[in-house]
Structure formats: C-alpha cells, structure tokens
Regions:
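Conserved mixed alpha/beta core segments that line enzyme active sites in large multi-domain catalysts
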Residues: 1-223
C-alpha cells in the first residue's frame, strides 16, 4: 500500500481492450479504488512513459472462424495503443505526452504519444468506476465473509459521455491458512459427511453453527 492506503482496500488492474491482456501478465495500471488519485505509475513522467500499457488485445473482425482453434487467442489481434485512437476508444482513458513541453496532459490531443492513465475516469469522474468498485467489494465481502476477487468490464460511450459496468465474475479469495493439503481421492466415501460435484472452492469458515441438508427428491420451492 502507498501512503494512507490499506491492504484491505484492495487494488485494481486496469487495461484497455480485452481481459486476456491482464491474464497474460500485460502492463496494467494498478490503483486502489479508495484512492484513485494515488497512482504510482503516473506520479512521474518518466515512470508513466515506461510503466504504462503500450499494446492491447482486440477482436479480429475479419476472422470468420474458418481457422477455429482451441487457442483462446486465435481470433484476437495484439495492437499498439495508438490503433485504438481511430475509433475513439482512448477518449476517456488516455493522456497525451507533449515532447516539446515535456509534460503529460490529461485527454487526447493531436500528435504525441498516447499514455493509458485512465485520468478522466479516476481523477475527473467521467465515469464513477472507483465508487462502483468500492460497492462491489463491500457487498461481495459482506456476503462471502472474506476478501473477494472480481473480474469486470466497462464500455464507455463517447457521444453520450456515459458508460456501462459489467460484473463478469466474483469469487472469494482463499487465504494462506485455507490451503488444502489433503488428497481427497484417498478419503473413503463412508468417512465423508457431505460430498458435492459442484463447489466454489475450499476454505476455512469458523463461524458456522448449523448445517442444513435439503433432499432434492420431491422438493419444490412452494414447500
């Protein structure tokens, strides 16, 4: 954590384009949703030019599926950030480096390298992403009773100057003490209290008082 940030407030990895870029370990913008003005990667010009996103993934709209593959990236294009400026995708998330004045200006201006800073979203409230993430984290942790990990997407409308937030996944984070070392295949069925083919993962919950088992045979919600 930086400055007055707290570990429990979490961090977010932001990137232009499809999420595969983040999954593959691409250079993302890391920020705490409770402190959107404190972004280490954009705190100095040299750091911003060196430590921000330079490429992104986009769908290859010319690929009609003739070379369909199990590779999840077969119909994706990896493009330089400047390519996204052609369709207005950078309007609210990029800044412009001015090599003459040696400064990075929030927003899109002619010429100059485009730097993915999300400044208009994080600092100028074009879209309330930090607040939305705070609420998702708050409600998610309250319901799951532990820190959560989320995946999300946002589309920003340049003409209407608004956007849509999509919550793609939310799951509990398993801490170190919940690591499972037991080989479940070695446990006999007669020694098992409950067994399921579907689960959200393993963990330790120390506040459980009761376990209710519902027989699904003949059960209806009206009962």
């Amino acid at each position: 954590p930086i400055g007055d940030e707290k570990a429990e407030e979490g961090t977010v990895s932001l990137a232009l384009g499809l999420g595969k870029y983040i999954v593959d370990g691409g250079l993302t913008l890391r920020v705490c949703p409770y402190h959107p003005n404190q972004v280490l990667q954009t705190s100095e010009m040299e750091i911003a030019l060196r430590e921000t996103q330079t490429q992104f993934y986009a769908l290859d709209l010319k690929n009609t599926g003739h070379n369909f593959s199990l590779d999840d990236g077969f119909n994706l294009l990896k493009l330089p950030v400047k390519e996204a400026d052609n369709d207005g995708a950078l309007t609210f998330i990029a800044s412009t480096y001015d090599p003459y004045d040696m400064i990075i200006r929030d927003g899109i201006y002619p010429g100059g390298r485009k730097v993915i800073t999300f400044a208009n979203v994080l600092q100028h409230d074009v879209f309330p992403l930090p607040r939305i993430l705070q609420l998702v984290q708050e409600y998610g942790q309250s319901e799951m009773r532990r820190p959560v990990e989320i995946e999300f997407a946002v589309t920003l409308n340049q003409q209407k100057k608004n956007g849509t937030f999509y919550l793609l996944q939310i799951r509990p984070m398993v801490d170190v003490k919940a690591n499972l070392e037991e080989d479940l295949n070695l446990i006999k069925d007669e020694d098992v209290l409950l067994k399921s083919n579907n689960s959200l993962g393993h963990g330790i919950m120390e506040d459980i008082q009761d376990v209710i088992y519902v027989k699904t045979d003949g059960y209806t919600a009206s009962n």
